[in-house]
Swiss-Prot record:
Subunit structure: EF-1 is composed of 4 subunits: alpha, beta, delta, and gamma.
Gene giving rise to this polypeptide: eEF1delta
Protein name: Probable elongation factor 1-delta
This protein's UniProt keywords: Elongation factor, Phosphoprotein, Protein biosynthesis
Chain positions found as Phosphoserine: 37, 53, 89, 137, 139
Record-stated family: Belongs to the EF-1-beta/EF-1-delta family.
Stretches for region Disordered: 110-146
Domain of life: Eukaryota
């Protein structure tokens, strides 16, 4: 009897009881933890929102406000496109007209031809006519007519050139003439200077200008023709008046 009782003894019962307890308590703990975890609820909301967004995109559902905004934008882009096409067309027309105008001007510039030179035809000598020039009288008349026309043109050109007014280059000069001392008579010195004459020289106004220590200088103006009177010659002529003149300076020089 004792041996049978020992054979029926379950030594691992406690381990099986613990496993059974864990099996039944596991789902309950997971359910309770979901109630108290905010992260799980946020994930569920995010999944729901993503699912709704995907359904809207698949169905191409847009709001009325968005549709009207897109329509306005498309209309604005179409208007700008038409305006750009119009401006490009106008620019092309303007460019074409400019090119045509330039081509016309180039043709006119390059198309100016000189007067054709009329060459008198010389009759060819015919050996069969024994060197008889049958058109000799006509050629002589043509040569005489050409010579007359040439003479008339030369005469007309000469007359036109003679009538043309030639521009004479002139200069207005102011000279400062300094005497030796205060005892020099400036009036006499001026008289002697004005005695210098030359074709193309015209004396002008004059005045006495104080220098220092009671000494004065003569400032006199004159107009000279550049082709006829040299400035160096004029100053040398004035300096030849050694009894009165110490030096001559050019105070002003202007072209007329």
């Amino acid at each position: 009897m004792k041996v049978e009782a020992l054979d029926k003894f379950w030594a691992d019962k406690s381990r099986y009881d613990l496993a059974e307890k864990r099996f039944y308590e596991g789902p309950q703990k997971v359910t309770d933890r979901s109630h108290y975890s905010p992260l799980v609820s946020e994930i569920a909301k995010a999944r729901e929102h993503i699912q709704n967004s995907l359904e809207k995109i698949d169905g191409v559902t847009l709001d009325d406000g968005l549709n009207s905004e897109l329509a306005k934008r498309l209309a604005q882009l179409e208007g700008e496109h038409k305006e750009l096409k119009t401006q490009v067309s106008l620019l092309n027309e303007l460019l074409t007209a400019t090119v045509k105008r330039l081509e016309t001007q180039l043709k006119l510039t390059n198309g100016v031809s000189k007067e054709p030179e009329v060459e008198a035809k010389k009759p060819e000598a015919n050996d069969d006519d024994d060197d008889v020039d049958l058109f000799g009288s006509d050629s002589e008349e043509e040569d005489g007519e050409a010579a007359r026309i040439r003479e008339e043109r030369l005469a007309a050109y000469a007359a036109k050139k003679a009538k043309k007014v030639q521009i004479i280059a002139k200069s207005n000069i102011i000279l400062d003439v300094k005497p030796w001392d205060d005892e020099t008579d400036l009036k006499v010195m001026e008289t002697e200077i004005r005695k210098i004459t030359q074709d193309g020289l015209l004396w002008g106004a004059s005045k006495f200008v104080p220098v220092a220590f009671g000494i004065q200088k003569l400032s006199i103006s004159c107009v000279v023709e550049d082709d006829k009177v040299s400035i160096d010659w004029l100053t040398e002529e004035i300096e030849k008046l050694e009894d009165f003149v110490q030096s001559v300076d050019i105070a002003a020089f202007n072209k007329i």
